[in-house]
């Protein structure tokens, strides 16, 4: 997020990581802008994480179409592929698309769990963590993971 003081997870990550993350993202964007469903990896800079994987969730206006659902699934797949390609041992996900992209939380959570469960069955060496930004998403993931 390049809007100063905008309240969103993306902006908070950039603030905590420091100015170098914004610079690295700006350089990436100069070479090629990502499309919904794609992901890119950068250094973590001042974050405790060594890397940040940036995924672009689709914007939902109205009902989420099958195409938008597939784009969200592809976000998770692309992110997990980057984690694997970069030999990462763990990855933490917020609830992609449920903020200002307006993806309905229950559907987004189910897509996330379907994709990550399938991936984890093939690659159990990578620890997958969910840390949703909003309380409603946190409660939803807690419920779905325990039932």
Language model segments and positions:
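Glycine-/small-residue-enriched capping loops at alpha/beta junctions
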Residues: 1-85
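Phosphate/ribose-phosphate-bearing ligand recognition and processing surfaces
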Residues: 59-147
């Amino acid at each position: 997020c390049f809007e100063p003081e905008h309240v969103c997870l993306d902006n908070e990550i950039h603030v905590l990581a420091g100015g170098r993350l914004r610079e690295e993202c700006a350089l990436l964007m100069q070479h090629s802008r990502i499309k919904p469903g794609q992901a890119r990896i950068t250094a973590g800079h001042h974050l405790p994480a060594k890397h940040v994987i940036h995924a672009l969730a689709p914007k939902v206006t109205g009902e989420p179409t099958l195409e938008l659902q597939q784009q969200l699934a592809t976000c998770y797949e692309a992110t997990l592929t980057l984690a694997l390609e970069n030999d990462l041992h763990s990855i933490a996900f917020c609830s992609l698309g449920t903020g200002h992209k307006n993806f309905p939380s229950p559907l987004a959570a189910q897509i996330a769990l379907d994709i990550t469960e399938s991936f984890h069955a093939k690659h159990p060496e990578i620890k997958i963590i969910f840390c949703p930004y909003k309380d409603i998403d946190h409660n939803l993931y807690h419920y779905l993971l325990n039932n």
